[in-house]
């Protein structure tokens, strides 16, 4: 099997799981408080930042500090548990497949899931910014190049974190211990 077919097999496995729904929940959870507390973006108290930048930063701070690491941990554990629950890893390892390619395919799927969550975060930002713009009569929508550049920086910073989480999840067989670390 070549690498792309291994990635395709891994993507088919997660299609039946609820990983995409699990990735959507933190995206929604992080932007609801921003809509509710939209009027606080105008109370800057001498901080030289515009309300629209404050809205953007406040919305993505929770994603960066907590939700992205938590989502990556959950995704790595779920990816490994789909293999272990149905003894799929034993079946895969009995085939003439390189274990290195198999691990790299899992890492690629994890990175694709993180990218999908980032795209959902961008979409949620623009939806919430449009709602708050309508509520406050002030334009909270930033230009797409600025938003995408910052989100790509967050995504690039999450790649080494995903590698560490996948390594820990692979080395520690119990899902409780791998989530705990």
Identify the residue ranges that each predicted region occupies.
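Transmembrane helix boundary and interhelical loop/hinge segments in multi-pass membrane proteins
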Residues: 74-93
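Short helix-to-coil transition segments within interhelical loops
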Residues: 93-99
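Helix-loop interface residues and adjacent transmembrane-helix termini in multi-pass membrane transporters
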Residues: 83, 96, 171-172
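Aromatic- and glycine-rich beta-strand/loop motifs that create alpha-glucan
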Residues: 1-27
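Central hydrophobic cores of alpha-helical transmembrane segments
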Residues: 23-30, 177-181
């Amino acid at each position: 099997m070549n690498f792309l077919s291994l990635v395709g097999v891994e993507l088919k496995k997660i299609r039946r799981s609820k990983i995409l729904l699990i990735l959507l929940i933190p995206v929604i959870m992080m932007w609801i408080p921003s809509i509710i507390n939209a009027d606080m973006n105008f109370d800057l108290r001498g901080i030289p930042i515009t309300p629209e930048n404050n809205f953007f930063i406040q919305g993505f701070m929770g994603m960066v500090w907590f939700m992205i690491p938590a989502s990556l941990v959950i995704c790595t554990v779920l990816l490994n548990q789909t293999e272990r629950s149905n003894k799929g890893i034993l079946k895969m390892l009995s085939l003439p497949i390189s274990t290195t390619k198999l691990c790299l395919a899992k890492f690629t799927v994890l990175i694709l899931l993180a990218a999908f969550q980032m795209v959902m975060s961008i979409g949620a930002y623009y939806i919430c910014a449009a709602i708050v713009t309508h509520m406050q009569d002030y334009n909270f929508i930033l230009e797409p190049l600025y938003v995408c550049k910052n989100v790509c920086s967050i995504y690039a910073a999450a790649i080494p974190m995903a590698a560490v989480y996948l390594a820990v999840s692979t080395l520690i067989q119990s899902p409780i211990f791998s989530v705990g670390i």
